[in-house]
């Protein structure tokens, strides 16, 4: 069986390396106190997935698209805005899927907002469409990156229709789900592995990931909690 690597780079940024390609999700690297690498680390990418326009998710995506030639994959409105600043883009929307050279991507809903902050104009906000999550199929495995979201009941449909090898869920609370909601989400999604994200980058989202792992073990032991420090990987 082909092995896939899911490497955490801090906050909500993940690099997924499969047999047919390498993708990066929500590349908030420069200015991220939790990141283990900067954008200069990446010389080849096959896709850059961005869940929404907030600066802690869009991050260095435009620069990386320009440098590597990889398409920035996101909702239509955000794609149009990023293209103005030189990014190569592939626009999609909620519920749609597309097959790329590295695998298949389907956009899911996420309960969150989205604005675009033009490079160098951080006080200027433009509405950037809906926030989203990603269902990614690579090497025959389904991975779910929820983006920034609150808990929603249709996570059960995601889990029912896609046998998830792994899911990345926010646990930071305040802006997204907290620990208890993420554990309940696990009961709906039923992933083999659950990787917490979007916590401890800023004071307002401080959480104890070990506490989350213990809560998951008590409430839903069918999913294995995988706490990754920036730079660490899960091989599946």
Swiss-Prot record:
Keywords assigned by UniProt, alphabetized: Hydrolase
SMART domains for this protein: Lactamase_B
Domain of life: Bacteria
InterPro entries: Metallo-B-lactamas, RibonucZ/Hydroxyglut_hydro, UPF0173, UPF0173_UPF0282_UlaG_hydrolase
SUPFAM superfamilies per UniProt: Metallo-hydrolase/oxidoreductase
GO molecular function, one term: hydrolase activity
HAMAP family noted in UniProt: UPF0173 (MF_00457)
Similarity comment: Belongs to the UPF0173 family.
Protein name per UniProt: UPF0173 metal-dependent hydrolase DSY1309
Organism this protein belongs to: Desulfitobacterium hafniense (strain Y51)
Upper lineage: Bacteria, Bacillati, Bacillota, Clostridia, Eubacteriales
């Amino acid at each position: 069986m082909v092995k896939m690597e899911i490497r955490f780079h801090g906050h909500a940024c993940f690099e997924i390396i499969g047999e047919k390609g390498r993708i990066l999700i929500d590349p908030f690297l420069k200015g991220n106190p939790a990141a283990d690498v900067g954008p200069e680390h990446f010389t080849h990418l096959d896709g850059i997935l961005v869940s929404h326009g907030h600066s802690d998710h869009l991050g260095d995506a435009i620069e990386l698209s320009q440098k590597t030639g990889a398409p920035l994959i996101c909702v239509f409105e955000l794609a149009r805005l990023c293209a103005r600043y030189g990014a190569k883009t592939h626009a999609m929307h909620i519920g749609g899927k597309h097959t790329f050279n590295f695998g298949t991507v389907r956009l899911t809903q996420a309960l969150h907002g989205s604005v675009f902050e033009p490079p160098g104009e951080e006080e200027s906000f433009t509405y950037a469409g809906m926030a989203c999550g990603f269902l990614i199929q690579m090497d025959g495995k389904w991975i779910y990156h929820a983006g920034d979201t609150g808990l929603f009941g249709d996570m059960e449909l995601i889990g029912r229709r896609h046998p998830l090898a792994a899911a990345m869920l926010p646990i930071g609370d305040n802006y997204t789900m907290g620990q208890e909601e993420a554990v309940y989400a696990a009961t709906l999604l039923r992933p083999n592995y659950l990787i917490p994200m979007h916590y401890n980058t800023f004071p307002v989202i401080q959480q104890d990931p070990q506490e989350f792992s213990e809560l998951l073990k008590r409430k839903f032991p069918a999913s294995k909690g995988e706490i990754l420090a920036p730079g660490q990987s899960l091989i599946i």
